[in-house]
């Protein structure tokens, strides 16, 4: 019902198993159902760790971005930047990597740290590529 009322539909879902780096079946199923129902982007939260990313029918599903505010025994976290334009073309999605420790979060600025972070995300994701600048794309578009 919402799809005709907006230019770009983002669905935010609280889901998943805490501290599990891979999404469980109900997450992938629900994320894909959201895309099938008209969502342009699905972003999940709750696991307190980064989870993989996939493109389903050309639309991104970001299963979890980790803990940005709260400290965690697993410090990796990220921001997701979504850049839209007025022409209605596909948005550019970028990951901004960070680490959370002792109650604060810092963004990674060292190129080696960023590259290691992107390689990790690719390893837990599903057929995606991440450029040196953090831009996400389906592997078949690289």
PLM segments and residue spans:
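Acidic, metal/ion-coordinating pockets
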Residues: 1-142
């Amino acid at each position: 019902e919402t799809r005709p009322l907006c230019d770009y539909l983002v669905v935010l879902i609280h889901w998943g198993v805490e501290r599990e780096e891979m999404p469980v079946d109900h997450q992938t199923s629900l994320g894909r159902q959201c895309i099938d129902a008209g969502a342009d982007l699905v972003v999940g939260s709750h696991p307190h760790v980064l989870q993989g990313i996939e493109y389903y029918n050309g639309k991104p599903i970001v299963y979890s971005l980790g803990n940005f505010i709260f400290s965690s025994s697993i410090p990796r976290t990220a921001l997701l930047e979504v850049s839209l334009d007025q022409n209605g073309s596909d948005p550019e999605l970028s990951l901004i990597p960070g680490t959370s420790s002792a109650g604060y979060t810092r963004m990674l600025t060292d190129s080696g740290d960023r590259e290691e972070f992107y390689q990790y995300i690719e390893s837990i994701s599903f057929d995606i590529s991440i450029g040196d600048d953090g831009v996400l794309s389906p592997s078949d578009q690289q």
